[in-house]
């Protein structure tokens, strides 16, 4: 009934495929993919939303399921911003060729999304599909742990990162994931987000999209802090973003683009390996209300102790590295498909060369889950000082 709280819903071991609203051959208007979520009718995989004024769901689990060939989102969970779904556990699911995002978590509190395999989100292989979508994204959510997932081959003219943190979130941690070949990019944190983090992930060839090519209206970006908080609203944030111990590899035929909004406040970037073989470029954030650029200085920045293949972080970006290490980590198999291909063989350059991560200046919170990490992306214990990148040399 109205105002009731329903506890413990579980979806387990379900197979969902070929879900379309229209018959084969239906073609969507080319502007449809430019709207924030699509305005037309679609088939969805699992869609859970709160249409009540005061009712709610708690302890929601979706696990061990396969969702394939859907015209929009694979899994979309949508609570209310003022009455969030509580305790959402999504694990061990396989999502393949969804026309929209793989998973969307809107207005959740205490989300754990782990060990999911999301491939070809935003798939354009059927004209009935939306053709845009990140592997996973959150909006209006607080306390989220997104870990041990694979985000691969996200496609679309905008967004379509491996995993992005949309606006109005707090305490979302993205860790121990593989992010590979996603058009939109790797790190994407939007506005009005507080204390969010990407740590101990491996990113391979993310952010290759070129604005203006085909239908693309956003640049792909390797690293993007965006103050966007919705159409027509004044940009602000993100606040206190922690990006550390990631291994980021981009091959020579991709320009690695970086966008940092001047409204960002509090940024920590440390212990990462930025292996950009090709060119790099500063670009402006390009959502529906674009970043106007211009001078600005971002307060409370700690951008130190990162390894770069070359000294080519773009000079126009409003955050600039210091105390960097320049060198080649000698990955076991640079350009490979697997996390283990990015095991660094240059031990002297990497081992115990990380620094302990501490709170950003004027941030009393850090990360609620804790800044210290016990294991690397492969499950190796972190001993002594942390190493550089996502893989600990034991």
Language-model-detected regions and their locations in the chain:
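Activation loop
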Residues: 2-3, 346
């Amino acid at each position: 009934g109205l105002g009731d709280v329903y506890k413990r819903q579980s979806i387990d071991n379900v197979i969902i495929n070929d879900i379309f609203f229209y018959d084969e051959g239906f073609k969507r208007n080319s502007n449809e993919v430019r709207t924030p979520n699509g305005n037309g009718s679609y088939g969805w995989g699992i869609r859970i939303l709160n249409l009540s004024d005061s009712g709610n769901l708690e302890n929601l689990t979706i696990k061990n399921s396969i969702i394939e060939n859907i015209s929009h989102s694979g899994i979309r969970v949508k609570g209310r911003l003022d009455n969030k779904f509580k305790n959402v556990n999504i694990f061990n699911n396989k999502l393949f060729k969804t026309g929209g995002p793989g998973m969307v978590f809107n207005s959740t509190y205490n989300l754990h999304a782990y060990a999911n395999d999301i491939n070809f989100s935003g798939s354009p292989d059927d004209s009935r599909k939306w053709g845009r979508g990140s592997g996973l994204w959150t909006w209006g959510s607080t306390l989220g742990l997104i870990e041990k997932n694979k985000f691969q081959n996200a496609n679309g003219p905008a967004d379509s990162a491996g995993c992005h943190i949309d606006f109005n979130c707090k305490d979302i941690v993205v860790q121990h994931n593989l992010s590979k070949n996603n058009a939109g990019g790797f790190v994407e944190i939007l506005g009005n987000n507080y204390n969010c983090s990407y740590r101990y992930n491996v990113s391979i060839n993310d952010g290759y999209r070129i604005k203006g090519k085909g239908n693309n209206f956003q640049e792909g970006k390797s690293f993007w802090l965006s103050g966007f908080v919705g159409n027509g609203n004044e940009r602000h944030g993100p606040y206190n973003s922690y990006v550390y111990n990631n291994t980021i590899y981009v091959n020579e035929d991709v320009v690695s683009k970086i966008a940092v909004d001047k409204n960002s406040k509090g940024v920590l970037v440390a212990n990462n390996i930025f292996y950009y073989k090709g060119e790099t470029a500063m670009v402006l954030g390009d959502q529906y209300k674009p970043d106007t650029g211009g001078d600005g200085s971002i307060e409370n920045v700690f951008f130190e102790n990162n390894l770069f293949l070359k000294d080519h972080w773009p000079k126009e970006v409003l955050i600039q590295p210091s105390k960097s290490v320049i060198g080649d980590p000698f990955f076991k198999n640079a350009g490979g498909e697997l996390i283990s291909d990015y095991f660094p063989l240059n031990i002297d350059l990497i081992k115990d060369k990380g620094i302990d991560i501490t709170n950003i200046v004027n941030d009393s919170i850090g990360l609620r889950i804790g800044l210290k990490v016990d294991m690397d992306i492969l499950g190796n214990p972190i001993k002594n000082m942390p190493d550089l990148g996502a893989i600990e040399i034991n």
